[in-house]
Every structure is written in structure tokens, then in C-alpha cells.
Amino acid sequence: NTDQSFPGFVGSEMWNPNTELSEDCLYLNVWIPAPKPKNATVMIWIYGGGFQTGTSSLHVYDGKFLSRVERVIVVSMNYRVGALGFLALPGNPEAPGNMGLFDQQLALQWVQKNIAAFGGNPKSVTLFGESAGAVSVSLHL
């Protein structure tokens, strides 16, 4: 289904303490201009939130306008935040730290392997973000 955030979570509900949440968060959103391009530039958005909160499902991060107007493929990702993403307990293999960055790295690898099937060029990828997302971009360089 187009124009639907997976898993149907509209983002703003994350502030409601009664919202049921899950660590199952490794999802990508992909916006493709119509008609499907051939060899399009890819822009990957990483949201901010101080590495503590956030989701790529917020309406403000909807990439369809950018994709349509600029004829680029826009990808956004979710990654683990807070203790699930960044808790580090030295010497404990259960909490090595920076798992949220590894989630991001996994998303970047997926884009490299699969974006051509969406009409994207894996050799023309731009990372961008705000706040912790911008810091993440610098950490992946």
C-alpha cells in the first residue's frame, strides 16, 4: 500500500505513555518518483532526537514531496534509540553499545544492495539528517 507508514504507527503516538511499542523497528521508508526512474540519485534521511527518541514515521519526515519535485529516491530508516540502541556495559556482550549505529549501517548496506531494483543508483547516495541524525551522518563517513 502506498502512502502508508509501516507498521501503521503515525509517530506522534510515541509521546503517549500508553502506546504499545516494540524493539522491532528495523524498517525503511522508500519514496520513488513516478514514473519509476532509471539510475536516480538516492537521498537517505536519518532523523534526530538526541539518540533518545524519534521515528522516521513522523509526518514532517514524509519524503514524497522531495522525491516527486526533485526526481530523487528518498529513503528514511528507523533505528534503536535510548538504552536499546546505545546502552554500553563494558565487558558485557549483551550491551556492547552503539547498536543504533549498527542498525543505521545495516540500512545503508541494504540500500546499496537493493536500491537499483527501485530505480536508484547505488553509486549516487547522499546521507542527510538533523540533530542526532546529522551526527550519525558524520559517524558513517
Swiss-Prot record:
Gene3D superfamilies cross-referenced by the UniProt entry: alpha/beta hydrolase
Location in the cell: Secreted
Cellular component aspect of the GO annotation: extracellular region
Glycan attachment sites: N39
Catalysed conversion reaction: an acylcholine + H2O = a carboxylate + choline + H(+)
Active site: residue positions: S131 (acyl-ester intermediate)
Record note on quaternary structure: Homotetramer; disulfide-linked. Dimer of dimers.
PANTHER family from the UniProt entry: ACETYLCHOLINESTERASE, CHOLINESTERASE
Homology family: Belongs to the type-B carboxylesterase/lipase family.
Biological function: Esterase with broad substrate specificity. Contributes to the inactivation of the neurotransmitter acetylcholine. Can degrade neurotoxic organophosphate esters.
The protein's name: Cholinesterase
Organism in which the protein naturally occurs: Sus scrofa
